[in-house]
């Protein structure tokens, strides 16, 4: 997933807000390899400092992007007024982390096979309209980057400094997510005073932003005027 899974939301919101869709390091269209979640957080904070005076109204993030957002909130308590974190894991998975390199080492070549890509895409429960974006970008990601950000994601744990964030944090997870994501959502909510957790019935990983852009955009409007 990348900027394109927020494309429709941006189109809906752009009449009222300036919407910026960053590309995380190592993803298709990025200008440098992936190094760490913290490095991505620092880079986005630096961009906001330079172009936005150090503060924006709202930041949203899904999965790896949600982890980057959590790190940003930990590093800069007032980086945004509102934060929307979706399907972010903060419970490390040592086994998955250890298996990432050998698994991608043996199967990386398959990602350019459309039939295999369609099977992978179906397992993600994403709307069909996003397949071409998914396939194009997946084919452009280097193996080293894919391994790097998968390992970073499976090793990520919540920065204790998150408790000091000044942002109003809204957490979303799908009812049908795996247990690690649901447990993570509870852990994040418990770590951030005043945060709000919504578990969305019937949804899988990232299903809120990926498959219901109208509702996601409306939620942003409601949060931003709360």
Put a short name on every predicted segment:
Residues 1-29:
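Conserved HGGG/HGGXW glycine-rich cap/lid loop of the alpha/beta-hydrolase fold
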Residues 39-57:
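Conserved acidic catalytic loop of the alpha/beta-hydrolase fold
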Residues 61-65, 69:
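Gly/Ala-rich beta-loop-alpha elbow adjacent to hydrolase catalytic centers
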Residues 70, 74-75, 80-110:
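Flexible "cap/lid" loop of the alpha/beta hydrolase fold
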Residues 94-96, 110-163:
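Conserved alpha/beta-hydrolase catalytic His-Asp/Glu region
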Residues 165, 171-173:
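Short beta-strand/loop motif that positions the catalytic acidic residue
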Residues 178-184:
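Conserved alpha/beta-hydrolase "acid-adjacent" motif
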Residues 203-214:
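Catalytic histidine-centered segment of alpha/beta-hydrolase-like enzymes
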């Amino acid at each position: 997933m990348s900027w394109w899974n927020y494309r429709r939301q941006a189109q809906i919101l752009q009449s009222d807000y300036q919407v910026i869709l960053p590309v995380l390091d190592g993803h298709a269209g990025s200008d440098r390899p992936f190094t760490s979640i913290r490095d991505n957080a620092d880079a986005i904070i630096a961009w906001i400092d330079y172009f936005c005076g150090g503060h924006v109204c709202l930041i949203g993030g899904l999965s790896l992007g949600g982890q980057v957002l959590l790190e940003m909130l930990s590093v800069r308590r007032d980086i945004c007024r509102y934060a929307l974190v979706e399907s972010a894991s903060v419970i490390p998975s040592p086994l998955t982390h250890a298996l990432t390199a050998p698994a991608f080492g043996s199967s990386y070549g398959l990602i350019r096979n459309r039939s295999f890509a369609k099977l992978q895409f179906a397992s993600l429960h994403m709307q069909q309209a996003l397949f071409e974006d998914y396939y194009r970008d997946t084919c452009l990601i280097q193996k080293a980057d894919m391994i790097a950000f998968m390992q970073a994601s499976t090793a990520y744990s919540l920065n204790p400094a998150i408790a000091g964030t000044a942002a109003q944090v809204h957490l979303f997870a799908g009812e049908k997510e795996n247990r690690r994501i649901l447990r993570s959502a509870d852990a994040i909510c418990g770590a951030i005073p005043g945060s709000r957790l919504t578990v969305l019935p019937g949804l899988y990983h990232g299903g809120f932003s990926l498959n219901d852009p109208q509702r996601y955009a409306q939620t942003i409007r409601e949060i931003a005027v709360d």
